Structure formats: C-alpha cells, structure tokens
Amino acid sequence: MELVLKLISSFCAIVVVILLGWRIFNWVWLRPRKLEKYLRNQGFNGNSYRLFFGDVKEMIVMLKEAKSKPINLYDDIIPRIIPLNQKIITNYGKNSFLWLGPKPMVHIMNPDHIKDVLSKFYQFQKPRHNPLTKLLATGVADAEGDRWAKHRKLINPAFHLEKLKNMLPAIYLSSSEIVTKWEEMVSTKGQFELDVLPYLETLTSDVISRTAFGSSYEEGRKIFQLQREQAELIIQASQTIYLPGMRFLPTKRNKRMKEIAKEVKIALKSIINKRLKAMEAGERSSHDDLLGILLESNSKEIKQHGNTNFGLTVDEVIEECKLFFFAGQETTSNLLVWTMILLSQHQDWQKRAKEEVLRTFGNNKPDFDGLNHLKVVNMILLEVLRLYPPILSLDRTIYEEIKLGEISLPAGVILLLPIILLHYDQEIWGDDAKEFNPERFSEGVLKATKGRVTYFPFSWGPRICIGQNFAMLEAKMAMAMILQRFSFVLSPSYAHAPHAIITLQPQYGAHLILHSLI
C-alpha cells in the first residue's frame, strides 16, 4: 500500500511538473510565435521573437548608450529618449511591433485607430506592468470599467471651474514664495545662475499640498517628501529587468518601499479621519480643498443611494490622494521647466509672452480672468506640451480578438500609442514639426490638428486627464509671475539631455541665468 501511495505521489508530481513546464514553454515560446505569425499576416512587421527577453535587452543597451552624453540644442530628441522605437519604425514602418519580453507591443499611429482605442475604454484597458508602481499611486488612473466610471464621477466636482477659481490663491502663494527667493538671489548683481528644476518641483509640490489638503498643508508636505522618496526607489527598481516575485525579496530597497507605503497610508488616513469628523461637525472650511471636495462628493453619493457601495472607501480615498501628489506635481513641474528652457532658446517668444503678461497685469497680482485671456502664453504652453509631453506614450491591452478599422488584433497584445512620435510626425505637423513654433496653435488645438487625434499630451477621450485644466492654470500663474519679474537665458553650463523616467525630464537639470526686470 505504501508503495502504491509513493507511486501515485510520484506520478502526480511528474504530471504537475509536466503541466507547469508546458505552461512556461507556451508562455515563453509557443504563444509569442503564434502572435507573431498573426501580426505579420495583418501587415505588421518587427524583429523576430527572441526567447524570453524579446527586444528588452537591446532596449536597455540602446537607452544606456543614448543617455551617456547630452545632445546639441537643436538635435532630434527622439533617438535619445526612445531609440528602439525609432529604430523599429525606421526599419519596418509605422505598422510595426517590438517585443516586451514574450509580449508583442504594436505601434498604433493611425489617428482613426487611436481615436477608437481611447474612446472604447471598456475594450482597451491599461496593461499590468511592474506592480511596484502601485506603491506610488493607483486611484482613478489605474481603475478600469465600472470602477473607473464610479471614481471619475466622484472626483469630477473637485476640478469644476468654480472650484479651480477657489484654488488660485494657493497657487499664487506657492508661486510667490519661489519668485521671491529668486529675487533675493538676483538682487545683489542684477543676475544669477541657478538650476531652476528643483525650485519648480518645490513650487508644484507646494501647490498640490495646499490645494489638496488646505489647513493640513504641513502634513501634506511630509507625505509628499515620502512620495518623492518612493518615486526615486521605484525608478531605481525600474532600471532593471523585473521578474515576477522580485518585490517580495527582503532587500533593503523593498523593505524601505514597504515602510514608506505604510507611513503614507497612516498619515493620509489620519488627515482623512480628521476631515470626516470636521464634516460631521458642519465645519465649512473642510470643503474648500481637493480632499474636502472629494469627501463631500463621496458623502452625497452614498446618501443619495443609501448604500456605501456607491461611494469610495477610506483606502480608495487614500489612493486618490496619492495620485493627486504624483500626477499633479510631475506634470506641471515638467511643463514649467521645459517652457523656461524653450523660452531661453527662443528670446522672440519670451519677449512676446512678457509683453502680453505686462499688458494684461502690469506688476499686479494675476487674476483668473486675466490668466484665461493670455493667448500667447497659452500657445507657448501647448507647443511645449507637443515637443516635450510629460508622458511619452499610452499603452492598452486587449483580452479578446478585436477589430481596429480593417485590422484584426489578437488577445494578449499590447497597443502602444506613441504620443511623442505623433507630436513629431512631419506628415501631420509639416516640415517644421521638430521646431518650436507656438504660432501653429494660434487658432486652438482643434484647428491645428484638423480635428484628428494627433495631439494628446493629457490623453484623449473619456479618460482624458481630469487635472489638465488645473495644470494649465497653475502653469499660467507661475509663468506670468516669472515673466513679470525676470528675463532668462540658457547658462553655458546647461547640458541638453531630455530623458524619460516616468515623465520626460532634463537629465542634468535646467541651468539658466536670470536677469531682474525690477
């Protein structure tokens, strides 16, 4: 009997090993080869699949080489930031794919196809990449389907026009603190050289802390510092090939990331619970910031339906707060730094922007209506977002065979919508596509794009960035206050080195020389 049990046990073990081996073999070889054949039959081309890693090794080598030295000011930035994508498209055309490990990633560059993908968010969902990024933020940006619709509905009130007007004093205060520091630096000699990037990052982080948490501003700043450390650790981790389960290894970095996640959750939960108590006590001041507006919207939805399932849990509110930090700070600080760099290069546009700001406000405090009438500044910001979008691409995955125009796509492929390649496409924007020319937006985005989905720095469709108007308002306020007080040029020590780590940033900072106007 004992022998029979041993034989059965051994047989079961062999079956498990065979099944596991078959699944692995199918995952790393059979399925990729099947998908490759399918895509080639649909007119897509790319490198032949290479076992397990696909094109990842080549991508890492090319990125390392591209980032090893700066480029000239007027060089094409595409080979530096996405060298493999450029190589694939140069070799195989726009209908091409590359391999992210055993998964094919298909370039989608037809504006009609992009419109379809970004419109049908139930069919085309965000893929699950490195799970470490969830430590940074999830919230509405990570949600799908009905869950996304619920989160979006509850967050929308925080970004209505009237609510944005109420946030302008906080934006002004944070901007004022930075320009005052710069005035002190410049005052002795009339000019001063500095790296503006860390100051702009401080400005945008302070704006988020004030507008998201209001009276809990100092607590918000501490949370933001933890989130910045978390982002740096995740960036370090993302520079290596991720293997499933790596986040569970007891490394120093993994331990610290878990500690930060725990600290942030405890701190945010404390702020949220205080706000809930204040709301119950009928304190109006608790409704004035992003968190207060979100909690009020959440409370109304629950009361209306008489069911907590229609609202967000405290943990879900925490994730939305983390998203406020990450998306709100990164997007606007990058927009501001590239705006200052490009206006340093193009003094004619800096002069036009300065004249418009001084004509509108003089040396007075910028107001909401005036900011919305800054046509030249708006054109400049739109052009900066075209040339230096915060996010280089969007990706989506499909879980069943889908028709996209005349093309069929199999389940399991990742669709890559390369924002920056569309923004630099000469077939779309003309021969000057790689040049800084805000005039192209003189009649607005719709006219510039001829109504096609070829410009989407904040995404497009139902899932367009909920905070885009907030980001643009903040950028206009900051630039108006900077242009009122300073002119600026590139420092000889400035090294032009755009690189993408989560967002598109200047690798060596932004060294400018400020000159006082006052």
Swiss-Prot record:
Membrane topology: Single-pass membrane protein
Keyword match Cell wall biogenesis/degradation: no
SUPFAM superfamilies registered for this protein in UniProt: Cytochrome P450
Matching InterPro entries: Cyt_P450, Cyt_P450_CS, Cyt_P450_E_grp-I, Cyt_P450_sf, Cytochrome_P450_Monooxygen
Family: Belongs to the cytochrome P450 family.
PANTHER family attached to this UniProt entry: CYTOCHROME P450 72A11-RELATED, CYTOCHROME P450 FAMILY MEMBER
Name listed for the protein in its UniProt record: Cytochrome P450 CYP72A219
Organism of origin: Panax ginseng (Korean ginseng)
